[in-house]
Amino acid sequence: MDYRKSHLHPDKGESYSALFTNNPYRNMVWQFEKSFLDSILTLFYRNSDIHHLDFACGTGRILSYLEDRTKSSTGVDLSPVMLEVARKNIKRADIIEEDLTQNDVLGDRKFNLITAFRFFPNAEAELRMQAMHVLSRHLEENGYIVFNNHLNTGSTINRLIKFVGRRGFKGMSIAEVKNLLSKNHLEIVKVFHICVLPASEDRMIFPLSLLRHVERFLAGIPVLRNLALNLVFVCKHECS
């Protein structure tokens, strides 16, 4: 199935948005992702005006979290049902319904913060490349692209799935992430990680309070990064 068509069902927007509140594991991950975003703003944008583009913004989760700390915020998505929910969640961000990989309506606009969450590992390889090409073109010289790979194929849970003889899930390997960035002349400057333990949205092997505590500890150990299910990459243009 073309990933472009995956979020067009009339009920998709509300049901997708509810997962981040109603599913304990996904909600836990979202709390960690918010803390990562806080750290990124502190590390890279202290005393700077932020002009933010959220690509594949969906229901506006990232936009609504960041918009009070940005000079300008723009969200782009091709799904009208997702954007219907986004418009309820945001206060002042601009919303554009478009597929930038096929019709780049942003023209020559530049942004110093571009985010793209829960998009790249779900998208087909060709779509990934098209999307990153567009985003790199709209990134200011000293700006950063922040995106996540929430389906790291080298994660602990995927390794265990394969170990017991089942087919692992589709997603992206870290090597694929690096290749995608290299081909678009981008380099990684910071990586955050979470979800090292083999838990999932459907099966929690530990009580949530314990899982949260342990994952917070494991998130501070860089050597475990390759085993994490969810990695957040901070990237910039390659130095010439």
For each feature predicted by the language model, list its residue ranges.
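A C-terminal cap/extension of S-adenosyl-L-methionine-dependent methyltransferases
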Residues: K190-S240
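A conserved beta-strand element that flanks and buttresses the S-adenosyl-L-methionine
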Residues: T115
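Class I SAM-dependent methyltransferase SAM/SAH-binding core
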Residues: T59-Q102
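Conserved beta-strand signature within the Rossmann-like core of class I S-adenosyl-L-methionine
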Residues: N142-N149
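Conserved class I S-adenosyl-L-methionine
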Residues: M1-Y45, S48-A56
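Short, glycine-/aromatic-enriched active-site segment of Class I SAM-dependent methyltransferases
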Residues: H150-G168
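A short glycine-rich, Lys/Arg-flanked "PGG" loop and its adjoining helix->strand segment in the class I
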Residues: M129-E141
